[in-house]
């Protein structure tokens, strides 16, 4: 069975937690689309194009993973991509309530779309893009939290030694 799954997010930047979920999803589904939301209201550190390129490099060894940017409603984009599975990561119980509401809204907007929740590996359970950026901003080491490509991009963008 050919199942197209969509893993959406802002990924500003992609972390080891995201990369772990992408790799595991690529083993569960025949095709995984990493859908990077434009979302200018979040004021991202990296442009959409930069995030797409970073994630393409991080996932280069996963042949069934495609990386694309998108704008608009996720439910509509999933329909355009013929995706029937929406992958979401749950780091803690605190994530569940919001994700539950989001899953119900997406199902209402696109009845063919089923949400599948994956939990991160224990060593990644506390990592978030926001925390990685904060550590990098204060010259902390981020190598344990993100791919070397991302670490270098953070150094280049923030102009500091991490």
UniProtKB/Swiss-Prot annotation:
A Pfam entry, by short name: CTP_transf_like
Enzyme Commission code: 2.7.7.3
NCBIfam families in alphabetical order: coaD_prev_kdtB, cyt_tran_rel
Requisite cofactors: Mg(2+)
Gene of this entry: coaD
UniProt GO BP: coenzyme A biosynthetic process
Subcellular localization(s) per the UniProt record: Cytoplasm
Gene3D superfamilies hit by this protein: HUPs
Protein name: Phosphopantetheine adenylyltransferase
Top-rank lineage group of the source organism: Bacteria
Pathway(s) the chain acts in: Cofactor biosynthesis; coenzyme A biosynthesis; CoA from (R)-pantothenate: step 4/5
InterPro entries found in the cross-reference section: Cyt_trans-like, PPAT, Rossmann-like_a/b/a_fold
GO MF terms held by the record: ATP binding; pantetheine-phosphate adenylyltransferase activity
Protein family: Belongs to the bacterial CoaD family.
Site (Transition state stabilizer): 18
Quaternary organization: Homohexamer.
